[in-house]
Amino acid sequence: MREEILEIFLLVNFVFILCTSIMVRIRYVSCKTNFDCVNLKCPTPFVTPKCVSGGCECPLKELLTLLSDTNYGVAACIDYCKAKGENAYTCILNHCYCRKPSM
């Protein structure tokens, strides 16, 4: 009986250690809102992490980037700069110029 309890304890311990290391490796961050995911860095600077099912994720659908030389209009320029964490400065001759927000 003691051996079975010891085996169960070791198994639970092993699963806990394994799951913890996996969560650290993929940088799992629990969340309730998108604001909780601000500190998570996504692979590309144009993607903002989102809270999905209680965990922060970098949405793969948004891994497409908008080039600075674009003809998509002012709204796309503003969204592009916002995705970079910057403010739209101006959109002239199909070029989108962003600037860092003032502190």
Swiss-Prot record:
Identify the stretch annotated as signal peptide in this record. Answer: 1-31
Major localization class: secreted
Which UniProt keyword terms apply here?
A: Antimicrobial, Disulfide bond, Fungicide, Plant defense, Secreted, Signal
Q: Which GO terms describe its cellular component?
A: extracellular region
* Cysteines engaged in disulfide bonds, as pairs: C31-C51, C37-C56, C42-C58
Keyword Disulfide bond applies: yes
Carries keyword Signal?
yes
Q: Where in the cell is it found?
A: Secreted
**Family under the similarity heading:** Belongs to the DEFL family.
Protein name as annotated: Putative defensin-like protein 305
State the species of origin.
Arabidopsis thaliana
- What are the top taxonomic ranks of the organism? Eukaryota, Viridiplantae, Streptophyta, Embryophyta, Tracheophyta
